[in-house]
From Swiss-Prot:
GO terms for molecular function: ornithine decarboxylase inhibitor activity. SUPFAM superfamilies: Acyl-CoA N-acyltransferases (Nat). Belongs to the ODC antizyme family. This is Ornithine decarboxylase antizyme 1. The gene is Oaz1. Ornithine decarboxylase (ODC) antizyme protein that negatively regulates ODC activity and intracellular polyamine biosynthesis and uptake in response to increased intracellular polyamine levels. Binds to ODC monomers, inhibiting the assembly of the functional ODC homodimer, and targets the monomers for ubiquitin-independent proteolytic destruction by the 26S proteasome. Triggers ODC degradation by inducing the exposure of a cryptic proteasome-interacting surface of ODC. Stabilizes AZIN2 by interfering with its ubiquitination. One of its GO terms (biological process) is positive regulation of protein catabolic process. PROSITE patterns: ODC_AZ. It comes from Mus musculus (Mouse).
Amino acid sequence: MVKSSLQRILNSHCFAREKEGDKRSATLHASRTMPLLSQHSRGGCSSESSRVALNCCSNLGPGPRWCSDVPHPPLKIPGGRGNSQRDHSLSASILYSDERLNVTEEPTSNDKTRVLSIQSTLTEAKQVTWRAVWSGGGLYIELPAGPLPEGSKDSFAALLEFAEEQLQADHVFICFPKNREDRAALLRTFSFLGFEIVRPGHPLVPKRPDACFMVYTLEREDPGEED
């Protein structure tokens, strides 16, 4: 069901722009520009960091409580260096792995919320990593700022298949700021893929008037039904 929709990604407007992005590194880490999800591992994100870039998650209302305003040390960029910074990879455990995806889970203080790093292998020299939160049957993905990383079209397709087949997710949410210059293009692209705009006040997303949420509902066939 998802697979047929995912074929549309190959010719979608936004993903066609991906080659305009930064090609200086063979490994592309979407998490570098996604503070909303990358600040979660201790169950909180600082007020200061939540105002940087997306600013999607602070003082949450109903929905997955994947971050709060409790200050803590900043996130260390995966594979990077720095003093007094945290590196999630040191404590992450492998949740799922095949020839296309390597999914690791980071420990959190909330047993109902899981922080995932989903790495998609496109070629031997190229990988794309998405940061996500898995909570209450929904997978929440924060889109990186700027043009989507090169290879995103194939990587995102594999991610949605993983959500449906391995996580048995009910919904996949994406989040990005309303003031993005490419907002209209993102809305067209993901609407074409079957995503719908989430109306304000929806119980499954935080109250963020400055953020846009879209949802893909994964419908399953009743095993008792026959054609």
